[in-house]
């Protein structure tokens, strides 16, 4: 096997510790924050990455005024690193015992739970079969309240995608949805089924319609996603949700020029980073590794 400069690569190996540090830096895009997360000094982390670059014979990072970004070889390595770490952890859990034990209370919005939780929980359970994950569903503002009360240990939440937040794990586009064949142009004002008034989908819908000069009325407001979807299925209102979570029997509405485009939202994790349990930290790292690939 030959490297980029023709050197023989048979004597080289991608060390697990180096790959773990690399993935964390790739996620937070800043050495200082990455060093705090992995429990090393910034100097030690820099030395680790220099060693990894020497092993792969490629530059992996480019420094910017705000931190670091991955080079093209770095982006390629990230895909391999996430897969290698996942398989390594699964093998260790299988061969060395039952993995972590205990209970974690995990908060997640309904639309994310529907789409993302099955694969996330399935893979985590294969690594830690004795761990129990209790699910608490609710909109982001309610989950943040639960975190403040320590009623949940870890929460997946939405936040505005302003392009400057390094904590975003995945981005999701907000879309208008309605019952197939139902035209928003036939309604004035436009009837809406929205989540709680302090949620991003509610705020985004009202702001967009206000800027477009489109009259609307909130026909139904609730933190229950099932209730919102039921109202849309009845043909009584239109709603806003992430594109990934749109049910197969409902339609994304994009043919009305008076129905303005909506922003994207970011997904991140919130928990007590100063004193997380081993189980909380492990589940958070699992989500960070797997969620971008779902």
Swiss-Prot record:
Domain of life: Bacteria
CDD domains tied to this protein: PBP2_LrhA_like (cd08439)
A Pfam family the protein falls into: LysR_substrate
Ranges where the HTH lysR-type domain occurs: 14-70
Keyword terms of this UniProt record: DNA-binding, Repressor, Transcription, Transcription regulation
DNA-binding region in chain numbering: 31-50
SUPFAM superfamilies with a match to the protein in the record: Periplasmic binding protein-like II, Winged helix' DNA-binding domain
Keyword Repressor appears in the UniProt entry: yes
GO molecular function: DNA binding; DNA-binding transcription factor activity
InterPro entries: LTTR, LysR_subst-bd, Tscrpt_reg_HTH_LysR, WH-like_DNA-bd_sf, WH_DNA-bd_sf
PANTHER family according to UniProt: HTH-TYPE TRANSCRIPTIONAL REGULATOR LRHA-RELATED, TRANSCRIPTIONAL REGULATOR
Protein family according to the UniProt entry: Belongs to the LysR transcriptional regulatory family.
Protein name stated in the entry: HTH-type transcriptional regulator DgdR
Source species: Burkholderia cepacia (Pseudomonas cepacia)
Gene that specifies this protein: dgdR
């Amino acid at each position: 096997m030959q490297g980029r400069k023709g050197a023989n690569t048979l004597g080289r190996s991608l060390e697990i510790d180096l790959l773990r540090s690399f993935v964390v830096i790739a996620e937070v895009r800043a050495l200082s924050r990455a060093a705090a997360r992995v429990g090393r000094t910034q100097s030690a982390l820099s030395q680790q990455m220099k060693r990894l670059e020497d092993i792969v014979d490629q530059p992996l990072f480019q420094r910017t005024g705000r931190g670091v970004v991955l080079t093209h070889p770095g982006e390629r390595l990230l895909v391999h690193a996430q897969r290698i770490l996942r398989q390594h952890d699964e093998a260790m859990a299988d061969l060395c015992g039952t993995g972590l034990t205990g209970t974690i209370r995990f908060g997640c919005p309904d639309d994310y739970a529907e789409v993302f939780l099955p694969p996330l929980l399935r893979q985590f359970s294969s690594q830690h079969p004795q761990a129990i994950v209790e699910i608490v569903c609710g909109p982001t503002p309610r989950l943040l309240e639960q975190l403040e009360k320590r009623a949940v240990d870890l929460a997946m939440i939405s936040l505005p995608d302003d392009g400057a937040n390094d904590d975003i794990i995945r981005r999701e586009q907000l879309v208008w949805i309605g019952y197939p064949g139902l035209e928003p142009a036939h309604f004035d004002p436009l009837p809406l089924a929205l989540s709680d008034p302090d949620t991003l989908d509610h705020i985004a819908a009202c702001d967009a319609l206000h800027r477009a000069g489109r009259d609307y009325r909130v026909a139904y407001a609730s933190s229950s996603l099932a209730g919102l979807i039921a109202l849309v299925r009845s043909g009584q209102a239109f709603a806003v949700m992430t594109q990934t979570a749109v049910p197969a029997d409902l339609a994304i509405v994009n043919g009305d020029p008076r129905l303005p485009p909506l922003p994207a939202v970011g997904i991140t994790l919130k928990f007590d980073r100063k004193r997380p349990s081993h189980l909380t930290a492990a589940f958070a790292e699992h989500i960070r590794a797997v969620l971008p690939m779902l």
